């Protein structure tokens, strides 16, 4: 069974406010002021919330035309994000496996922790080709090693990091129960 990617049709609209600077790889997203109360209440009713949100921008002919292989956080697990991706061309997302002894801690431009490893230490385990990702909403396993291949056009992804009421990350199996629509 795939525990890495699932397209969802969220029952409420998401108010997309695109960053003014499309050439920064990662910027904070003000979800508190840009999400409807209906959207936030849906999470609250299920004892989950958005821990933080950011926007990732990658584009051709720039320093950032792909997303390097990494795992979000301090360890490998199955925590999820909700992503909304906008891109005029198909996007390829890959997930990878590696022996944990090769993992190295690093940080994103927003100072969030992540794990990386040398490229020759990875084994590709799953690929998802988003053929028409313009506004596609999906659950995304961010706790496993993943990366995006080079893109042909500007690609903007809104990432919502989902947490349980106790502050822990929402894990894939529980997300499948909550987002079964």
Question: Which ranges hold each PLM region?
Answer:
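Non-catalytic surface loops within mature trypsin-like serine protease
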Residues: 12, 86-88, 162-166
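Catalytic core of Fe(II)/2-oxoglutarate
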Residues: 109-181
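A general secondary-structure boundary signal
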Residues: 4-13, 94, 139, 159-161
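A general structural signal for short secondary-structure junctions and capping/turn motifs
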Residues: 42-47, 71-76, 128-131, 148-152
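Extracellular structured ligand-interaction cores
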Residues: 5, 77-83, 90, 145, ...
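Catalytic core of non-heme Fe(II) oxygenases with the double-stranded beta-helix
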Residues: 59-137
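Non-heme Fe(II)/2-oxoglutarate
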Residues: 1-58, 63-66
């Amino acid at each position: 069974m795939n525990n890495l990617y699932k397209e969802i049709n969220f029952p409420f609209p998401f108010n997309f406010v695109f960053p003014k600077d499309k050439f920064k790889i990662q910027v904070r997203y003000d979800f508190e002021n840009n999400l409807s109360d209906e959207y936030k209440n849906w999470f609250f009713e299920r004892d989950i919330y958005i821990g933080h949100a950011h926007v990732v921008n990658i584009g051709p002919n720039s320093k950032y035309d792909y997303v390097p292989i990494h795992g979000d956080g301090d360890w490998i697990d199955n925590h999820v994000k909700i992503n909304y991706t906008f891109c005029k061309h198909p996007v390829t997302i890959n997930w990878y496996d590696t022996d944990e002894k090769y993992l190295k801690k690093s940080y994103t431009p927003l100072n969030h922790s992540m794990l990386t490893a040398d490229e020759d230490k990875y084994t590709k385990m799953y690929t998802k080709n988003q053929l028409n990702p313009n506004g596609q909403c999906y659950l995304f396993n961010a706790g496993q090693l993943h990366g995006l291949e080079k893109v042909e056009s500007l690609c903007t992804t809104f990432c919502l990091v989902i947490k349980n009421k106790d502050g822990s990350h929402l894990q894939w199996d529980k997300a499948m129960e909550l987002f079964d629509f």
